[in-house]
Amino acid sequence: MFSVQYENQKFTLGEGTNAVITLCPAKIECNGKEITGTAVYDLEKGEICTKIASLTVRDTYTNAGDGLYKVLRVIENGGTNTLTFRDIFEVQTAFAPARYLIPCVNYNGNDGCRENTPTGLTRDGEAWIFAYDRTGIPACTLCENKNFGSAIFAADDSESSLRSACSLVKNANGTFTQRIYHPVVEAPYTYSSKNILTERYDEYTTLKPGETFTAAMYVFACVPMYENYAAANLLDHAADVFSLALDPCLTPKQVWDLGIDYAKALLYDYKGHKMIITHFAPRLFRSQHGAAITPEEMQRRLRDPYYTEIGRFDERFEMGWADQGLLNARMLAADAIERGDKEMLDTAIGIFESWADKQQKNGLLRTQFQQYYEAEAYDFANPDVCNFGWGAAEMSRMYTMLREHGIEKPKFRDFAVKLCDFFCEHYSDKYGFGKSWTLEGECVMPNGSIGGFLALGMLETYRVTKDKKYLDTAIKACNFYYNRDLDKFICSAGALDCQSIDKETAYPFIYVSLILFEETGEQIYLDRAKKAAYYFFSWAFHYDVLYGEDSEFTQYGYHTKGGTAISTEHHAIDSWGSAAVTPFLLLAHYTGDDRWVKRAHAMWANAIQGIASEDNRTFHGQMRPLGSQNEGFFQCRWTKYRPTCEERGHYNDCLCAWSGAYRMMTLYDQKVNEKVKDMFLERK
């Protein structure tokens, strides 16, 4: 038996005592039983040959450099009978990991997440097995301690390689066994919808006598870049293994104009105020979104035009988060200034004024505008620091932008100041800024990393006022959240519609750390920006998932590469990556690492797919508003918007307000930020 060894600061294949990853003989599963055989090792050729009944399994290891090995597995049926089986490739850590990761799926056990979601390593005594299409690096698992990291993942160079699954098993001695299965399996259950587990899913390979099966995989060993950040090493290599080059389907100008078109379509008259409404969506959306409908009833309603008609049926108006009322309005204002459209500029300013007028003396306000008028309004919720953070940031940014064009609106600056003053006074050493608050100033939900959004609001307010208390409070908060969460490669609670580990909560920490680096010049903040960005991109798809001709992804030409998974509760892709483009480009500017540019371009190219344009407006038989885009892209056996999870590769019909706002924010930043304006990707 040989292994990946570490000696003299180099990784090699060998048989010594400095093992990091032990390379195991092949196994197959046949008729529900796992079988292995006699293995012959040839270190000179880098081969392990295992005989299992009539099968010969030959693994050839090729050194790809810096701890990365490509493995080519060839299975030949040398017998006289046809065999149906599942192939198992496995390695074992030679160290006891302190943490583990299945990207997009399981972040060290998903502590604090809901019971009917994948948590821990097992369920009902069996190891979780997840299909490749749930993970941003195919069938990837990673284990680490402070000294070493171990990862394996499938290649995307053939269908047989890619159609795979993965699992992790903790052994009695504290080591881990990491597995890749071919073909696809999900067990002991399929996580098929929001907090719903259904029956397992199994595929098998059949080989006739004389036939072969070939699949490629990778084994990776590293010394973690930072403690708990072996994923950073892995992601740097993944950027080379999987080409992230993509050609955007729209030009930046087209994306901007379509974003403005949709923001205008979202303008809504409500109780004498102009607001940005939450979305265009079908009436069926409410019951789908909360998974509050049976598959049978959903099937019935999907045939009823009353339920499937797309419209503005939900009177919800949120300051930040999912509706991005203020950000959309600021983008409308920027466009109106550029075009000389005074009427639209006044409308955009009016939206800000309506929100500012609701602020209490203590600085707080409801974060959903309709709650001032409808006590039992749809999606009623306590005010939260995600919205407060966006509110302070956008009021400060709008104040600055208007002032640069000769328009004084001190009310907007004062709004940000009062809101930030409240949280300077109510910051807690135990929970930071918390999550949800009453209007009276009581923290009713202290959990999560969501306070990063408020730290961003603090720094934008500091930029306007130069009051050092906002800078100091942001630094104090970041120290807290990094020490508790980010330094452990975890973020939670930013996605307000789930109880989950998620991606979007990392976004403000990238930006906040970059601002602090620019303000102080201290290296710790650049390292923190990198950490948050690596965590964010651990949710990114590095490859294109495979679909049949009947899939909507195939019909609409959607590619998963560059997309970012939502959370450990919501196993789908969204276009949130567009918001992180500018900070990723800033990281490239400050570090000189071009991989951040590649990542930014990939996220952008993914995020502009499926936008309704004059040439492409009809989806699911309905004409969508110009510039709209569905909120979710459902790449695996998980959905809330179909009666069965087997309809992999489909769009939903919730045409959200936030996605266009983030794209416009990024395009606006490209225009005004000299550091990144020449780094943006034009359509070829």
Where are these regions (language model features)?
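Extended, well-ordered alpha-helical scaffold segments
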Residues: 230-269, 340-358, 404-426, 466-483, ...
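Beta-strand/loop-rich accessory regions of lumenal/periplasmic or secreted enzymes
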Residues: 30-56, 60-212, 218-220
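Aromatic- and glycine-enriched glycan-recognition loops and surfaces
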Residues: 301-362, 376-386, 402-418, 472
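Well-ordered alpha-helical scaffold segments within catalytic/enzyme domains
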Residues: 326-342, 390-408, 453-467, 508-522, ...
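Solvent-exposed loop and edge beta-strand segments that line ligand/cofactor-binding
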Residues: 200-203, 304-325, 374-390, 434-453, ...
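Low-complexity, Ser/Thr/Pro/Gly-enriched N-terminal "stalk/linker" regions
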Residues: 225-317, 350, 354-371, 417, ...
